[in-house]
Structures are given as structure tokens and as C-alpha cells.
């Protein structure tokens, strides 16, 4: 893995970040079968449930992007926004959307966590049949590039869900194959590699946590799955069905069978049980965080922010409404290597600023915006994604 030389503030930010909804669970009913109950916020540090976002009994407002109209779905089918067999979940923080798929359907759903409006993305790329366990989409996560990724059980489909303008686009990136050194710990075998969930790291690699507890690193360039090891410290016969990175950079895993959540250190795969709820049936987890990420967002002031964080028109807005902020500010844009690639001076008058900043010559990708005051104190550090 590449070693980046980051400015000191990148190692320290995040300590003052306020609590927010950034970690979510797909929760089932108390039954041995997969039966969808709700999407909910959850505390990724202690395993305690928060606000319920959407349930199996909620009124579903579904808009089909293909048909450009609202649709009424048949709840008795496998292809609806509240199907009983949902097993994948990802979180897109740039739009506050939860993205998910029913396990036996090619439909992709995008649920806005605030408005509860749902966009249906129909497509002919996903090849799923209910009777073929190899084809079931069971792992999903947001990549560091801002796109959503999903993998079926056998690795024969590696899906990318991206947004072009106002439309979601689905692509199949190809077949993921076993690394030659995997031996008996095969990514493509039911007993060792199927099911579970996936997370992303800061270099847009992925880690699949299979139901067996085996962990595989997925190289997106080579489309290979390399066996990393097996989680230690979880109870015997624990089924790993959800995985997501928390705000401390640890991986939280959960089980569909009704069990405690565990926090896993990706460096050594050692786990410890979280003290929260001990019998949640969790089919998938999702968060805004990434493994090995030194660019975690932080904001020292509640009334200083930038928007949008997904930039598709080459500019951002800087907004200040805080009497304690005075004089000149410096906004610096860093790339993923920690290199300063752009600077802009900002002037605050009477604690107020609302300025549009043009991001010239920035190619698509992730960047960090750092804003400091005249003394050099960091007031804001926030990641943005530049897209077309």
C-alpha cells in the first residue's frame, strides 16, 4: 500500500466532529429466515440503535428513473422497495441516500434518508435468479471515488453504480477471480467466500468479509480476491452478514442470526464485542467511513461549511455565519497524496461570508478542502468528490 505524506492537520482532524447519522443498519425481523424489517441509524462505536429511517410497513413513494414517473409496486413480488429478502446496503453521504437491492432482483433502490423518497433504477446489467445462489447480490459498499459497488456471491458480477447528471448508471466491471495463493480459502466457494458484506479503503480497494468470517482484499485493477485471514474473537458459528467502518477506522461486523456486534481491527483481524444491543438481526451495514483513511472530515465551527461535497459544476460555495470568524481565511485544496494543488484567499466581514469558489483544472476524484484563519488554525477539513 502506498504511503502518503500528509500535512499534520490531516492526522489530527475529526476530534471535534459532531455526532451525526453516518452509520446505518439493514435490520430483519426476529426469525431464522431473511425478512426485512427496517433501515435504521446505529451508533457504530457502541452498537446501539438510533432513528428508524424506513420500515417494511412504511408508505413507499417510488419514482422510476427509466419511466420518469411514479410507480406502484406489487409487494407480493421479489422486485419491490420493501421486498422481504433485502441483503445489501450502502450509504452515499454526498446526497444522504441509502442504496440497496433485493437479493432476488436486478432492481436498485435509492432511498433519501431525509425525505424518504425512493428512486428505482431498473437495468438489464444485473443478472439475478432466485434459484441460483451464485448470482445473489449480497455485498455492497460506497467506494472512495463516490460510486456504489456490489458483488454477487460467486464474484461473477462486480457492479458499479454511478451517477451521471441526474441519472444512475449501472456497469459490470467483470469477474473477480481467486488469487493463486488462496488455496483452500477460496473467494468463489460457498463454504469460504460467499455472503457477508464489503467495505472500501482510501485507495479504492475493497475488503469482503464473507459469512464464514474469512476476509478477502479485492484489487479493482486486477479483479483478484486475495485471502487476508479470518476474524478472531467472534463466537463459534458466528455468521458475518454486515460490515462497515466506524468513525475510529475499525470495522464493525454484525450477524443476521441475532447476535452482538463486534469491532474488528483490519490490521490483525482481532475483534472485540461491542457493549450495545446483543440480539439484532442485521443483514447489512453501511457508513460514510473508509479503512486506512487519513482524510476524515472535521469541522471546528458549526457555522462554517462548504457545499456541495459532490462537485459536478466545478465550483463550491463557502458559507460563514459566525461572529468569532474574522479577517482573512485561506482555503487550500489537497489531492490524495497530500499535495497542495490550489489556494484561495477569502475575506470575512462581520462574521459573514457566502462566496462561490471556482475549482479550476481539477480532474475527477477525491480532494480535501482545508480552511484556516490568519493564525493558521484549521477551521474546517472536508472531503469533496469532483465528478462530471
Which residues make up each language-model segment?
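Repeated scaffold domains used in trafficking and secretory/extracellular systems
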Residues: 62-65, 75, 79-90, 127-141, ...
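Blade-level signature of beta-propeller repeat domains, shared across WD40, Kelch, NHL, RCC1
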Residues: 254-296
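Beta-propeller fold detector
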Residues: 48-76, 118-129, 168-184, 224-233, ...
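C-terminal outer-membrane/trafficking sorting elements
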Residues: 305-307, 312-388
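An edge-strand/N-cap motif at the start of beta-rich repeat modules
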Residues: 19-52
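Conserved beta-propeller blade signature
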Residues: 21-28, 97-101, 147-151, 205-209, ...
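Residue-level detector of functionally pivotal "anchor" positions at catalytic/ligand-binding pockets or at interdomain
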Residues: 288-313
Amino acid at each position: 500500500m502506498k504511503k502518503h505524506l500528509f500535512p499534520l492537520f490531516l492526522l489530527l482532524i475529526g476530534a471535534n466532529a459532531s455526532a451525526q447519522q453516518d452509520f446505518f443498519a439493514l435490520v430483519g425481523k426476529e426469525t431464522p429466515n431473511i425478512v426485512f424489517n427496517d433501515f435504521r441509524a446505529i451508533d457504530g462505536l457502541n452498537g446501539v440503535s438510533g432513528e428508524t429511517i424506513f420500515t417494511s410497513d412504511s408508505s413507499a413513494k417510488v419514482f422510476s428513473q427509466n419511466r420518469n414517473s411514479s410507480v406502484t409496486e406489487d409487494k407480493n413480488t421479489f422486485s419491490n422497495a420493501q421486498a422481504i429478502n433485502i441483503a445489501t446496503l450502502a450509504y452515499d453521504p454526498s446526497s444522504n441516500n441509502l442504496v440497496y437491492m433485493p437479493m432476488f432482483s436486478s432492481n436498485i433502490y435509492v432511498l433519501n434518508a431525509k425525505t424518504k423518497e425512493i428512486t428505482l433504477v431498473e437495468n438489464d446489467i444485473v443478472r439475478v435468479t432466485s434459484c441460483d445462489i451464485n448470482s445473489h447480490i449480497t455485498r455492497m459498499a460506497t467506494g472512495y471515488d463516490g460510486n456504489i459497488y456490489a458483488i454477487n456471491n460467486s464474484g461473477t458480477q462486480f457492479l458499479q453504480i454511478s451517477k451521471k447528471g441526474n441519472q444512475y448508471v449501472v456497469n459490470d466491471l467483470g469477474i473477480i477471480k481467486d488469487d493463486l495463493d488462496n488455496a483452500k480459502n477460496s473467494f468463489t466457494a460457498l463454504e469460504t467466500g460467499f455472503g457477508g458484506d464489503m467495505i472500501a479503503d482510501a485507495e479504492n480497494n475493497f475488503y469482503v468479509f464473507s459469512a464464514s468470517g474469512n476476509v478477502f482484499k479485492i484489487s479493482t485493477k486486477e479483479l483478484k480476491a486475495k485471502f487476508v485471514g479470518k476474524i478472531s474473537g467472534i463466537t463459534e458459528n458466528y455468521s458475518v452478514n454486515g460490515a462497515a467502518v466506524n468513525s475510529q477506522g475499525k470495522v464493525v461486523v454484525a450477524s443476521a442470526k441475532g447476535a452482538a456486534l463486534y469491532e474488528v481491527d483490519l490490521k490483525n483481524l482481532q475483534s472485540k464485542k461491542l457493549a450495545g444491543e446483543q440480539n439484532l438481526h442485521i443483514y447489512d451495514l453501511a457508513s460514510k467511513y473508509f479503512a486506512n483513511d487519513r482524510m476524515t472530515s472535521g469541522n471546528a465551527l458549526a457555522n462554517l461549511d462548504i457545499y456541495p461535497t459532490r462537485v459536478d459544476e466545478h465550483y463550491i460555495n463557502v458559507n460563514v455565519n459566525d461572529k468569532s470568524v474574522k479577517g482573512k481565511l485561506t482555503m487550500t485544496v489537497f489531492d490524495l497524496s497530500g499535495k497542495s494543488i490550489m489556494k484561495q484567499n477569502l475575506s470575512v466581514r462581520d462574521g459573514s461570508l457566502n462566496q462561490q469558489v471556482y475549482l479550476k483544472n481539477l480532474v475527477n476524484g477525491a480532494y480535501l478542502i482545508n480552511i484556516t484563519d490568519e493564525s493558521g488554525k484549521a477551521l474546517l477539513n472536508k472531503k469533496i468528490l469532483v465528478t462530471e
